A protein has these predicted regions:
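Hydrophobic face of amphipathic alpha-helices that form TPR/SEL1-like repeat modules
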Residues: 1-28, 114
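Residue-level signal for inorganic ion chemistry
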Residues: 30, 66, 88, 111, ...
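Short, well-ordered beta-strand elements within core beta-sheets of diverse protein domains
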Residues: 32-39, 54-60, 107, 142, ...
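Long amphipathic alpha-helix in the N-terminal Rossmann-like dinucleotide-binding domain
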Residues: 49, 71-82, 96-121
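ALDH superfamily catalytic-core signature
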Residues: 226-370, 433, 478-479
Length: 479
């Protein structure tokens, strides 16, 4: 069992101000694998003070120095990437096949993207007689979730370092071990003292202290809409910048001209990826009403072919849910779907056959779902798919947009131009055409209650900059 009780503050591993142990559980075995400390306000204050001290000098570092630092972080991260993949699998249950292919490498992708952007990005530009200057926003507080730990940590930390900001990170207490390893990577890479600080803790204590702290200039939060509202309320009195990536209930429109069987099976696999614990999962599958019987057959086949089991086994497609509370929530919502009259196509209540230990649920598909049902409105965050029939294309677009969320959308068509036309009408921050994956040089973020601001790529880097106008330069001479 690992002892990870220390916090990383001001370039050193330090003991918490007060002892408060918390057990980290492997959700596949329900066994304790590590102990961390839950921090308090004193720990946050110490970390913020370190970040505030470091900001004046780090914000003035040259572009070449920041690029060199990022390259060193990349080098160290690469040397420990297998350890990162194993750590993520232990702490949140994702299969090793997924942590090796995506969960661990995504951190490298964001670091490399930051270096790429800095190769051309202009921090100063002349607009007539005015110098438009982009400066680091300041001390940043990051509150990150457990479902894609390195994605959500590094897509914040990489642009913060790239722009000259300093950081206080509170990772999820359910999956803190990858963050602990990441702090070790930054330390080994030589990140200056105070530039990156990490304090473990829960949301109501450490998260709230970060959101409300008067010396933090920006808060970036990823998590539930409920928690996002609390973060925004805590941040409001200090009028700091707040960016949020919250929940989703993304629609997957399978158009009438799509290859139905291929589109349905691809949609099921995408919904179940990471055990359905992705905020942009395509959890509402919209199918032409006349084709629904065939779609149900394809969805049942895809669900029954999805193996939930030991994350270390090569044959495993999905692992457990991340914890006991998440297991209870998903089971409650599956039961709600049954109570409200949806037709169970595959899966259902209880653990998969032969599974006695771990927070595993059955890959579940519902048909005959109405868009006003609870399972079509609430973010379930588990491997649960809702199949919803539509009459025509206008009806499909209306259903897709009839949600309080707006993170992602999916459109499948045999005609890519047709898919693109429909994609432009989806009220969401990201739309995937014909199974296209997200690209790191794009951006990620949502409309409506899915949040505000953007992460990834150049748009994500811009979030960490203040725009200053300096008047009084010599106007350009006319030729």
């Amino acid at each position: 069992m690992k002892d990870c009780r220390q916090f990383y503050i001001d370039g050193k591993w330090v003991a918490p101000a007060a002892a408060s142990d918390f057990s980290v559980t492997n959700p596949a075995t329900e066994e304790t694998i590590a102990t961390i400390s839950l921090g308090g306000i004193a720990d946050v204050n110490k970390a913020v003070a370190a970040a505030k001290r470091a900001f004046p000098s780090f914000s003035e570092t040259g572009l070449e120095d920041r690029v060199a630092l990022l390259r060193k972080i990349i080098e160290v991260y690469q040397s420990r990437i297998e350890e990162m993949a194993e750590t993520i699998s232990w702490e949140m249950g994702a299969p090793m096949s997924l942590t090796r292919a995506a969960q661990a490498p995504v951190g490298l992708a964001h670091l490399n993207e930051a270096v790429r952007i800095l190769s051309y990005f202009k921090f100063e530009e002349m607009h007539g007689s005015t110098m438009m200057r982009k400066e680091p926003v300041g001390v940043c507080g990051f509150i990150t979730p457990w479902n894609w730990p390195m994605n959500q940590i590094v897509c914040k930390v990489a642009p913060a370092i790239a722009t000259g900001c300093t950081v206080i990170l509170k990772p999820s207490e359910l999956a803190p071990l990858s963050a602990y390893l990441f702090a070790q990577i930054l330390d080994e890479a030589g990140v200056p003292a105070g530039v990156f600080n990490m304090v473990n803790g829960d949301g109501p204590t450490v998260g709230a202290a970060i959101a409300s702290h008067p010396d933090i200039d920006m808060v970036s939060f990823t998590g539930s809409a409920r928690a996002g509202v609390a973060v925004a309320q805590a941040a409001a009195p200090t009028v700091k910048r707040v960016t949020q990536e919250l929940g989703g209930k993304s629609a997957n429109i399978i158009l009438d001209d799509a290859d139905l069987e291929k589109a349905v099976k691809q949609g099921v696999q995408s919904c179940f990826r990471n055990t359905g614990q992705s905020c942009d999962a395509p959890t509402r599958m919209l199918v032409p009403k006349a084709k629904m019987p065939a779609a149900i057959v394809a969805a049942r086949q895809a669900a029954e072919a999805t193996k939930a089991g030991n994350p270390l086994a090569e044959a495993t497609h999905i692992g457990p849910l991340a914890g006991k509370a998440q297991f209870a929530k998903v089971e409650r919502l599956i039961n709600k779907g049954l109570e409200e009259g949806a037709t169970l196509v595959a899966g259902g209540l209880g653990k998969p056959d032969g599974v006695t230990k771990g927070y595993f649920v059955q890959p579940t598909v519902f048909a005959d779902v109405r868009n006003d049902m609870t399972i079509a409105r609430e973010e379930i965050f588990g491997p649960v798919l809702c199949m919803i029939p539509y009459d025509d294309e206008e009806h499909a677009i209306a259903i897709a947009n009839d949600t309080p969320y707006g993170l992602s959308g999916y459109v499948t068509s045999g005609d890519v131009d047709h898919a693109r036309r429909v994609a432009k009408r989806i009220r969401a921050g990201n739309v995937h055409i014909n199974g296209a994956r997200s690209a790191f040089d794009g951006c990620f973020g949502g409309y409506k209650q899915s949040g505000n601001g953007r992460e990834w790529g150049e748009a994500g880097l811009e979030e960490f900059l203040e725009l200053k106008a300096i008047f009084g330069y010599e106007p350009p001479k006319k030729s």
